[in-house]
Amino acid sequence: MFKKNDRSQSRTRRHMRVRKKIFGTAERPRLSVYRSEKHIYAQLIDDVEGKTLVAASSSEKGFDGVGSNKEGAKLVGKMVAEKALEKGLKKVVFDRGGFIYHGRIKELAEGAREAGLDF
């Protein structure tokens, strides 16, 4: 009998494969994205130090949108880009977190690019 793979296990395996190749530094941090049913989260991570440099999410107090749609994801992308530019970070490495690059993940990336991040 074949065992059916569940989506979360497949996503985790995809993410581990990608993480072998993607590495963030202080000069070029990793833009890590996580998508839940209700919210979307983005953070810039320095993997050398193991620290989060900048973070933004749709669950923050100042967020004026819905985190479970594309418009909200685009706002989160712009928020994380603005915070990064304030700290002098312009170049990043995009880590989609094992999620397929479409929908909310794509909108977050486009919002970050529009606000000035380079990846």
UniProtKB/Swiss-Prot annotation:
One cellular-component annotation, GO: cytosolic large ribosomal subunit
Gene Ontology biological-process entries: translation
Gene3D superfamilies the record matches: 3.30.420.100
InterPro entries per UniProt: Ribosomal_uL18_bac-type, Ribosomal_uL18_bac/euk
A molecular-function term among this protein's GO annotations: structural constituent of ribosome
Keywords from the named record: Ribonucleoprotein, Ribosomal protein, RNA-binding, rRNA-binding
Pfam families the record matches: Ribosomal_L18p
Keyword Ribosomal protein: yes
Keyword rRNA-binding in annotation: yes
Record-linked PANTHER family: 39S RIBOSOMAL PROTEIN L18, MITOCHONDRIAL, LARGE RIBOSOMAL SUBUNIT PROTEIN UL18M
Purpose: This is one of the proteins that bind and probably mediate the attachment of the 5S RNA into the large ribosomal subunit, where it forms part of the central protuberance.
Family under the similarity heading: Belongs to the universal ribosomal protein uL18 family.
Subunit note: Part of the 50S ribosomal subunit; part of the 5S rRNA/L5/L18/L25 subcomplex. Contacts the 5S and 23S rRNAs.
Full protein name: Large ribosomal subunit protein uL18
